[in-house]
């Protein structure tokens, strides 16, 4: 029940984010003297609309049947758009370049503002996590190897454990167990569990790669939460670096913390976005039944499923944090300098400005607006790529969705 409610809530949150994105365009367009003819949430047949007068004429507001986005129709966005004679003085393509760029940037800027507001709220209510938690197999502590009595209870042991006796210390990063290279603590533990007896282990200390022989000790462990009895597995007596709890803030200290955290988050999101083109093969493999790579991109469908999981688990902080990340990503993607994205229109306006500055320096008159009809073939290519990628991600999210618990 809560899972379904969570899906609906997150889908609505995405729709509100898109609607506010379009509001950003509309508000700045009006403020800079451009006429907004229509503002709609959704696509397809109109369910409801109303027209309201303003100082530049009137604007039609409405809701359409397919809640997968929205649009803000500004008169004369390009020189090839149809425009009524009375709207020509307010046409967007006739305005100064800085005004056009401001209108185009206002949409993505609204997404960034939404993300910042959400991060600020999270900082005050729940605190902000450390984005640089150790992800590799770094040793937090060494100790003796105790058997596991029950799922909640460990047995007793004394003295140093196998890892400590072999010279491994807290802070060392284990990179190889026997012939198995390990990337994280879970992978290291899984490799050790399969072993028994002296094993060569490589680790990094102060940037240097070292190795030692550790006598892997057999012990009793419950290997899964639903196991009825413990199994005999190998252990070396090391534990992971504990996860740092979220840092707490008040309404004042949360302001600089929000910007600092968002800067770190932007770097991590940028790394993820840069990997998108390399994940096509992983998406195809996931659709075919392979394991879904947790770094593969998701669609609105996948995002809503994850939103549903967070609500079902009562993880409201994860719900809002995921929505904040999504808004940052939406804003960044819309600034890609390719048509039909906002960034593509900004690139065209910037090109016109630079071109006319050069012409003016040469004593020539300013040239006319860029002919968007000549740019349509390239625009269609971008649309085809985006549509294909969306189809791929939606299919993967339906047949093999990502989960926050995997």
Swiss-Prot record:
Binding site for Zn(2+): 21, 25, 206
GO molecular function terms listed in the Swiss-Prot or TrEMBL record: metal ion binding; metalloendopeptidase activity
Active-site residues, Swiss-Prot/TrEMBL: 22
GO biological process, one term: proteolysis
Phenotype upon gene inactivation: Not essential. No degradation of PbpB (PBP3, FtsI) in the presence of mutant Wag31 upon H(2)O(2) exposure. Altered processing of anti-sigma factors RskA, RslA and RslM.
CC annotations in GO: plasma membrane
Domain PDZ as annotated: residue spans: 125-209
Pfam family membership, one: Peptidase_M50
Cofactor(s) needed: Zn(2+)
Enzyme class: hydrolase
Name this protein carries in UniProt: Zinc metalloprotease Rip1
Organism, scientific name: Mycolicibacterium smegmatis (strain ATCC 700084 / mc(2)155) (Mycobacterium smegmatis)
Lineage: Bacteria, Bacillati, Actinomycetota, Actinomycetes, Mycobacteriales
């Amino acid at each position: 029940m809560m899972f379904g409610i969570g899906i609906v809530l997150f889908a609505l949150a995405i729709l509100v984010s898109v609607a506010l994105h379009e509001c950003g365009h509309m508000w700045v367009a009006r403020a800079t003297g451009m006429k907004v003819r229509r503002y709609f949430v959704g696509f397809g047949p109109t369910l409801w609309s109303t027209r309201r007068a303003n100082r530049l004429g009137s604007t039609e507001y409405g809701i359409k049947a397919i809640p997968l986005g929205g649009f803000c129709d500004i008169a004369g966005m390009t020189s090839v758009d149809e425009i009524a004679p009375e709207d020509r003085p307010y046409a967007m393509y006739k305005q100064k370049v800085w005004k056009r760029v401001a209108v185009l940037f206002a949409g993505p800027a609204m997404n960034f503002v939404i993300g910042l507001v959400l991060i600020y709220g999270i900082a005050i209510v729940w605190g902000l996590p450390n984005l640089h938690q150790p992800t590799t197999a770094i040793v937090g502590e060494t100790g003796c190897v105790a058997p596991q009595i029950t799922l909640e209870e460990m047995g007793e042991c004394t003295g140093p454990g196998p890892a400590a006796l072999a010279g491994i210390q807290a802070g060392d990063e284990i990179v190889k167990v026997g012939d198995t290279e390990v990337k994280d603590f879970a992978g290291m533990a899984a490799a050790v569990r399969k072993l028994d007896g002296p094993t060569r282990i490589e680790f990094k200390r102060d940037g240097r790669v070292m190795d030692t022989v550790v006598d892997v000790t057999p012990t009793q462990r419950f290997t899964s939460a639903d196991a009825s009895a413990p199994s005999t597995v190998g252990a070396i007596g090391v534990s992971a670096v504990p996860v740092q709890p979220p840092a707490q803030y008040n309404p004042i200290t949360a302001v600089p913390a929000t910007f600092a955290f968002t800067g770190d988050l932007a770097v991590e999101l940028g790394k993820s976005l840069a990997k998108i083109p390399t994940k096509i093969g992983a998406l195809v493999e996931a659709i075919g039944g392979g394991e879904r790579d947790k770094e593969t991109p998701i669609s609105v469908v996948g995002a809503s499923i994850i939103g549903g999981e967070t609500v079902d688990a009562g993880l409201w902080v994860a719900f809002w944090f995921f929505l904040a990340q999504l808004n940052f990503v939406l804003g960044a993607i819309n600034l890609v300098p390719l048509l039909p994205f906002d960034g593509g229109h900004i690139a065209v306006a910037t090109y016109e400005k630079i071109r006319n500055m050069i012409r003016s320096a040469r004593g020539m008159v300013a040239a006319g607006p860029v002919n968007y009809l000549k740019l349509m073939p390239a625009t269609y290519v971008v649309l085809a790529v985006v549509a294909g990628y969306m189809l791929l991600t939606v299919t993967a999210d339906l047949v093999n969705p990502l989960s926050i618990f995997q």
